[in-house]
Design a protein with these regions (language model features):
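A penicillin-recognizing enzyme superfamily signal
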Residues: 2-184
Length: 185
């Protein structure tokens, strides 16, 4: 599911592991990929993709995924997750070329512990994996803002438009908060 956000809105068939090598670099396993497609169907509007990409990047820049900044990249996006009663913890994250999801849970469902959240239990595993997976992959630029998207400074304390203390948030033009009267529509 996250691949469609990572690649700009195109539906592709993901695969889990491309190959496995031993410590000496000998190939142990290689995935037999199906016929390589040269085209893919665009299944999400570019405005949806841009907005979701912005939201998921913010999770890493300022939110529960902030530890991923330790990778030293600005092209990462993701979402932490913790189920009720801390039974499962996960992190789903991506860079344009790689989507990886980590899950922490028990074979027989039961609480992991009060402090075992997606950001504490699953995110560190994702970071360790991505350290290796991203080696040699150049950092991507953010998506270009498509037509029909408006940026507005929103006060993080009130959620209202504010030109002074706001952070940039993106809206469909037809759904953007109005800044002229202070009313939200």
């Amino acid at each position: 599911g996250y691949a469609v956000f990572a690649n700009g809105g195109y539906l592709i068939e993901p695969y889990f592991i491309s190959h496995i090598e031993d410590i000496e670099g000998n190939l142990i396993f290689k995935t037999k990929l199906q016929r390589k497609r040269t085209t893919a169907d665009q299944v999400l509007d570019t405005r949806n993709v841009f907005t979701m990409d912005s939201l998921l990047r913010n999770v890493i820049q300022n939110g529960t995924g902030i530890r991923a900044k330790s990778l030293g990249r600005k092209d990462l996006a993701g979402k932490t997750g913790t189920t009720n009663d801390n039974i499962d913890a996960w992190f789903a994250g991506f860079q344009r070329r790689i989507v990886a999801i980590t899950w922490v849970g028990k074979d027989q469902p039961g609480p992991l512990g009060d402090k075992e959240t997606g950001s504490k239990a699953a995110l560190p595993i994702w970071i360790d994996y991505m350290k290796t997976a991203l080696k040699g992959i150049p950092e991507d630029k953010p998506l270009a803002r498509p037509e029909g998207i408006k940026s507005i400074l929103i006060d993080p304390k009130t959620g209202l438009p504010n030109d002074k203390n706001g952070v940039i948030e993106y809206f469909y033009e037809e759904n953007a908060p109005r800044t002229d009267s202070g009313a939200l529509f």
